[in-house]
Amino acid sequence: MRHTPRKRFGQHFLVDTSVIAEIIHIIHPVPGDRMIEIGPGLGALTKPLLNVLDELQVIEIDRDIVDYLSRTYPGKLVIHNIDALKFDFSELGEGLRIIGNLPYNISTPLLFHLSRFSSLITDMYFMLQLEVVERMVALPSTPDYGRLSIMLQNRFEMEQMLVVPAESFDPPPRVQSAIVCMRPKAEPTIPLKHERLFAELVSAAFSQRRKTLRNTLRHYLTADDFERLEIDSGLRAENLSLAQYAAIVRQVYEDRQ
């Protein structure tokens, strides 16, 4: 099929066969897997996955690609013609394995959308902009550590698996890409009942990265609170571990009761 990649959908089609083979090896699909592919494009991963799987669910917003996939892979392919940001993944049950070459223009909101369904997910493998993957897996006190790191690390264990050069795509993106593996934790570090407060505190802490916690969290914690938590209020948001954010969330939650 000749298909002109659509800029508004952020389409960059994976065409490097050696990279495709390596990704399939990393994912390691087996018969019986409940696999969902987001943004299958022209089927670079779809075809080798269907060689193994009994059924593959795909989510694709581009109507032309949906028509092509329907004609090319009848039978074992179940196609959802919808924006992945609007898809209710709970409709597909549990034990989900989700993969995809995610459009870079919606990757961050899509990751947060998928986080809502973490209890139903076994693992996820995504092709993303390398810079985004580096932020996802970043450690405290490093330049890439920020809101994305903390919010996702609360729910997932994550690992950067493979760097993919721009020339592996058609058209080549202006950035390097990478595969990231995401596995949900048995229990989030910060309980889901506190997630709204957690997000509020993290946003406040990172609202002015150059300022100290004494300033950014002044509406949430007193000097005595910082001392009780054994957290230096002269630190900045990027210096705190997830465990320290969990302690802050507990303190603020208790203060509000």
Swiss-Prot record:
Segments traversing the membrane: none
Q: Which domain of life is it from?
A: Bacteria
Record-linked InterPro entries: KsgA/Erm, rRNA_Ade_diMease-like_C, rRNA_Ade_Mease_Trfase_CS, rRNA_Ade_methylase_Trfase_N, rRNA_adenine_dimethylase, SAM-dependent_MTases_sf
Q: Which SUPFAM superfamilies match?
A: S-adenosyl-L-methionine-dependent methyltransferases (SSF53335)
| Keywords from the UniProt entry | Cytoplasm, Methyltransferase, RNA-binding, rRNA processing, S-adenosyl-L-methionine, Transferase
Query: What Pfam families does the record point to?
Result: RrnaAD (PF00398)
- Reaction(s) catalysed (UniProt annotation): adenosine(1518)/adenosine(1519) in 16S rRNA + 4 S-adenosyl-L-methionine = N(6)-dimethyladenosine(1518)/N(6)-dimethyladenosine(1519) in 16S rRNA + 4 S-adenosyl-L-homocysteine + 4 H(+)
Q: Where does S-adenosyl-L-methionine bind?
A: H12, L14, G39, E60, D83, N101
- What are the EC numbers? 2.1.1.182
Could you give one GO CC term from the UniProt record? Answer: cytosol
The main enzyme category here is transferase
Q: Which GO terms describe its molecular function?
A: 16S rRNA (adenine(1518)-N(6)/adenine(1519)-N(6))-dimethyltransferase activity; RNA binding
Q: What is its main location?
A: cytoplasm
Subcellular location, record wording: Cytoplasm
The UniProt entry, under HAMAP family, shows: 16SrRNA_methyltr_A
Reported function = Specifically dimethylates two adjacent adenosines (A1518 and A1519) in the loop of a conserved hairpin near the 3'-end of 16S rRNA in the 30S particle. May play a critical role in biogenesis of 30S subunits.
Q: Which PANTHER family match?
A: DIMETHYLADENOSINE TRANSFERASE (PTHR11727), DIMETHYLADENOSINE TRANSFERASE-RELATED (PTHR11727:SF7)
> What family is reported?
Belongs to the class I-like SAM-binding methyltransferase superfamily. rRNA adenine N(6)-methyltransferase family. RsmA subfamily.
Q: What is this protein called?
A: Ribosomal RNA small subunit methyltransferase A
Protein species of origin: Nitrosomonas europaea (strain ATCC 19718 / CIP 103999 / KCTC 2705 / NBRC 14298)
Its gene? rsmA
